[in-house]
């Protein structure tokens, strides 16, 4: 598995480490981290050096992988896809590229999302941004691209080498979109839970959507389990008088207050008489006694003092940053 890390790869590397929690710390293969060359941050002299070498890291990884097929996946989509079923679908068809899509209401998409243009035979002829798509007001569903593409490794290497020769310096996702146009790709429909994360608001909405039991089971309790890092912590403790409704709680926490429709990460403390509703409380956060939190995201290791009111809206959650300490009401804005 090769992960292309963003501008600052520290948090990604800190989470993945050696890949042991996913059995990726093997002698052969395993986990590879590759820096992403963000051209907005690259000095002009380095851009010149990257010309004709922009995809070298990916090519080297693919050659060393010795795999017959490769899957290119964006990190903006949350889902639980059966890659074996995708491979079977690909092998039964003639096109060298298979693209994955999900049928969704066009009203749920933003201009930056992309959709597949499908033929009557179910082939994808293009990947079009919503901002440029011509969709009838009567259209109830469109084929939203999940930015997942499958190709033979040999074909993918050739695609990257050709891009190097041309001097292309665009994202791998954009290259795959061009491959769809060139080859009339196979189109594989994904029917499970899917959420698109492109900003803080969509991240908040995706977490709230997972609290729906049907979505939760579709994502986490299908035949394909999702694994995360093992901490070997004790279960979260719920004190006498605490209340918890429609919430997800990680391990190692201590809850004295009230939880309603919230996602609580590991090792979180919520003190007595506090009310937490429609919130995301990340690892190691501390919530003081008598607080009222609604439509908020509390980042890792943040501390909220007692008797404070933190309130955002369902479309614009209030965010407390990582490690921030808030002890005065004047430090935060309250949105009604």
Please report, for each region that a protein language model flagged, where it lies by residue.
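Unchanged
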Residues: 1-208, 320
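Left-handed beta-helix
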Residues: 154, 162-336
